[in-house]
């Protein structure tokens, strides 16, 4: 048996007509003479904090990667997650991203989360290592214990500052960077900004005891070279403290053995050079090709331009 329509549904059917919605919504998409697009290209808005012209063909990403004389941005332990690398929580006023948004005229109640600003690199890159739970082994108290927080130590001065200020300092110096880490680097939920952030900071290579699979792939896609310590070798056996300069030499090929050259001063002021064999974690020829192009976007642009010429 079919039930009879209620009085309310009958009234709605008589009062609400499709034409009412068409009258309101269709004109919203009709561009007038003033609004007609002058160009097929998107008109980037300089004040937007949500979508901004990507910088992936500019700055550090446009410069050649030398893999020479790199300074460590951080020396990290085991189980560093993508949330350490690029948190997605709410943006606080006293954070680097919060200060930037405030400067851009955004009220604090509209800061939103880091995740919502992924389309604006000027906001999102300030999330790099912005996790207050981070332990950067380069930042220690006077008793030698590691200080918790989004901190870094800028070398050669040895000055400790907030991570973003350290990144800015190195960016202004055009200083290539490296990250040293323990096992299971990059575990957790997949976040593209966990790789984008370090690359935009100027990180050219990451040496770890092991990588999470998806994050390693994302690093390759951003043109960051993943390197793996040989078994039994790590930041502790090498007694790394962050004052060193790092270079990588050798033929980059799938899982080839490269040499990590570490230069540091000894206690008596003499120079010491260590040559440490590491495994290149570009696992396939395709990954080598993507890395050599500068990343997956650069590789795509390269293939597109070559196709246009052909």
Question: Locations of the language-model features?
Answer:
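Generic secondary-structure signature for well-ordered alpha-helical cores
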Residues: 17, 81, 106, 129, ...
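Autoprocessing domains of the Hint superfamily
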Residues: 188, 275-310
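Short hydrophobic alpha-helical runs that function as membrane-insertion/retention elements
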Residues: 204-209, 226-229
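Non-catalytic terminal/interface segments that mediate subunit docking, oligomerization
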Residues: 32-207
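Glycine/proline-enriched, intrinsically flexible loops and inter-domain linkers
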Residues: 24, 213-214
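Acidic, glycine-rich flexible loop/linker segments
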Residues: 215-290
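Short, small-residue-biased leader/transition segments that mark boundaries at the very start
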Residues: 2-9
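Histidine-centered active-site/metal-ligand motif
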Residues: 2, 193, 215
